[in-house]
């Protein structure tokens, strides 16, 4: 009896010891480790499958196709280099030049006066920076001095009605000021107190309440546009979604219950829970939903909790695909018996779990990492292909690799991994969500992972480090609407300030159709607002990744 108890204690000790070692390794990596999930396969033979003739034939065909891809990409890149304009040391021609001309010496001036030709020789150009400039646009009306007072008043009121509508009392603030604040806080993640310094350096020192007031007015003016983007996103074939935490300052008073208002109901629940624990803030959530390439908008939704109410309310009636993490709240919404949505799971999440466990068992983790790597090789090669062609290669090559992965999951190596170990948990994660992980092979338009939505979360994470908290539920909802405009403009490589100025101006005046202000449509008529260097940078990066992938496959 005592011996059995000792054995149980020994097993428990070994289990706890293993957990401590895993936590210690994770902590060391968090502090000083490389966070890149780069995996170099220690045994390239793992990528060969002589026992599986169908898969080996597909891999051989992929190598031949990769060789052709290398030739195509190399030819295209070399052609682009030849056609590229030679780089010069001169600054852009459209920048204003302030000229400083040094006069001739006295002796040379005499020669010039006698008829010697003089020409100007550029010695050097120096780039200078002038801080942003604020100015006041004053409107005047000429009035006859003898005019009656009532006629003068009528003329002034008529003129005031003709002045372009601004924001605030009597329209005192132009849309350009509101756009500058919105870009500062939601694109560049600058808190209000630092925005004060920026404006003060240009001669105007606004209070933080004034800056916040202008954001209120901005959100009110543009509120219909985020709603339109949301409706468009719900027409997507696939929606990516994710969420992250935001600190919400505890409201002073518990609001009254409103029948059917789930937001208020969740707020009351969270407040009562926080007050019971003695907290002064609430752990709210900012959700992000991203449409596909046919509905290219990124929308944000502020909620006081991670309860399923948020996605359930926003996705009500949606019948497409949903790519999200495997949080139970998401699963309950997508897998609800009344739902017609198709759940997808993220291969980047699956890979990350195995990668984080590889130090505990490098031998067992090598094959699944290599197989997932091959899935991504196919995705990189097919990145710019038509969706029909991408569907075909997924149905052939990707499907065979997934079959090999399934065989490994059901095989002796995976079965022998301790379920409680980190690798065992990663393997079980893939087993649990296998069907959702394989959905992408059915349609070339579907994504293989949720990375593009996770990048949206970085916007909130960086902003959170600067502005620290949200002051109220209303402010959270307001911020979500403005962030929707900023992120969607950024997705289309637009100058966000130029876009917001135009959007705020037209919506405040009611002088444009809402659809014309969607960033993809607006972009087509405003080429001067496109950050072409970002488009070129992304295109070059993707092309280089395809070239490296094709080269590696063709040489393996």
PLM segments and residue spans:
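Short, positively charged, Gly/Tyr-enriched micro-motifs
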Residues: 1, 7, 23, 131-237, ...
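Short, flexible loop/hinge motifs at secondary-structure junctions
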Residues: 1-171, 240-241, 247, 260-279, ...
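Mobile genetic element proteins and their domesticated derivatives, centered on retroelements
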Residues: 33, 108-110, 146, 181, ...
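Gly/Pro-rich turn-and-neighbor structural signature
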Residues: 87-92, 96-112, 193-313, 317, ...
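Short helix/loop capping segments that flank catalytic or ligand/cofactor-binding pockets
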Residues: 118-120, 154-158, 248-250, 257-258, ...
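Structured ligand/cofactor/substrate-binding pocket environments in proteins
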Residues: 172-179, 187-190, 298-336, 476-483
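Conserved beta-strand -> loop -> alpha-helix junction used to position metal-binding or nucleic-acid-contacting
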Residues: 238-239, 326, 335-370
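Acidic/histidine-rich catalytic cores and adjacent linkers
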Residues: 317-320, 324-331, 370-556
């Amino acid at each position: 009896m005592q011996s059995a108890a000792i054995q149980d204690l020994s097993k428990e000790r070994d289990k706890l010891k293993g957990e401590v070692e895993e936590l210690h390794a994770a902590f060391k990596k968090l502090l000083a480790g490389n966070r890149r999930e780069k995996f170099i396969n220690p045994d390239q033979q793992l990528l060969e499958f002589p026992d599986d003739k169908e898969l080996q034939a597909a891999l051989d065909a992929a190598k031949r196709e990769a060789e052709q891809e290398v030739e195509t990409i190399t030819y295209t890149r070399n052609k682009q280099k030849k056609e590229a304009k030679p780089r010069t040391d001169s600054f852009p021609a459209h920048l204003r030049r302030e000229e400083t001309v040094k006069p001739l010496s006295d002796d040379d001036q005499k020669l010039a006066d006698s008829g010697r030709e003089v020409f100007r020789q550029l010695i050097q150009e120096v780039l200078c920076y002038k801080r942003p400039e604020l100015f006041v646009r004053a409107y005047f009306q000429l009035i006859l001095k003898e005019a009656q007072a009532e006629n003068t008043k009528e003329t002034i009121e008529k003129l005031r009605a003709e002045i372009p509508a601004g924001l605030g009392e009597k329209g005192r603030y132009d849309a350009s000021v509101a756009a500058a604040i919105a870009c500062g806080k939601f694109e560049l993640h600058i808190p209000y107190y630092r925005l004060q310094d920026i404006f003060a350096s240009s001669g105007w020192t606004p209070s933080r309440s004034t800056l916040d007031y202008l954001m209120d007015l901005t959100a009110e003016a543009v509120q219909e546009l985020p709603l339109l983007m949301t409706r468009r996103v719900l027409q997507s074939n696939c929606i990516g979604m994710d969420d992250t935490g935001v600190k919400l300052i505890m409201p002073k008073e518990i609001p009254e219950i409103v029948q059917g208002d789930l937001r208020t109901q969740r707020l009351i629940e969270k407040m009562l829970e926080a007050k019971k624990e003695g907290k002064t803030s609430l752990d709210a959530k900012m959700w992000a939903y991203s449409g596909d390439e046919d509905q290219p908008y990124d929308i944000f939704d502020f909620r006081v909790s991670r309860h399923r109410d948020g996605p359930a309310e926003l996705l009500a009636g949606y019948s497409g695909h949903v790519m999200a993490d495997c949080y139970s709240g998401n699963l309950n919404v997508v897998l609800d018996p009344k739902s017609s949505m198709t759940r997808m799971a993220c291969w980047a999440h699956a890979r990350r779990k195995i990668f984080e466990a590889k130090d505990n068992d490098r031998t067992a983790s090598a094959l699944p990492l290599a197989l997932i790597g091959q899935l991504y090789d196919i995705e990189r090669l097919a990145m710019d292909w038509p969706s029909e062609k991408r569907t075909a290669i997924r149905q052939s090559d990707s499907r065979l690799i997934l079959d090999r992965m399934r065989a490994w999951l059901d095989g002796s190596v995976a079965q022998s991994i301790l379920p409680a170990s980190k690798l065992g948990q990663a393997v079980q994660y893939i087993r649990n969500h296998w069907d959702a992980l394989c959905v992408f092979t059915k349609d070339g338009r579907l994504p293989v992972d949720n990375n593009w939505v996770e990048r949206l979360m970085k916007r909130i994470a960086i902003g959170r480090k600067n502005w620290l908290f949200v002051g109220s539920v209303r402010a959270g909802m307001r911020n979500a609407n403005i962030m929707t405009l900023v992120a969607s403009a950024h997705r289309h490589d637009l100058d966000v300030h130029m876009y917001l100025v135009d959007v705020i101006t037209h919506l405040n005046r009611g002088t444009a159709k809402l659809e014309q202000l969607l960033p993809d449509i607006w972009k087509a008529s405003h080429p001067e607002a496109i950050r072409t260097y970002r488009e070129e940078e992304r295109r070059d990066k993707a092309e280089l990744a395809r070239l490296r992938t094709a080269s590696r496959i063709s040489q393996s």
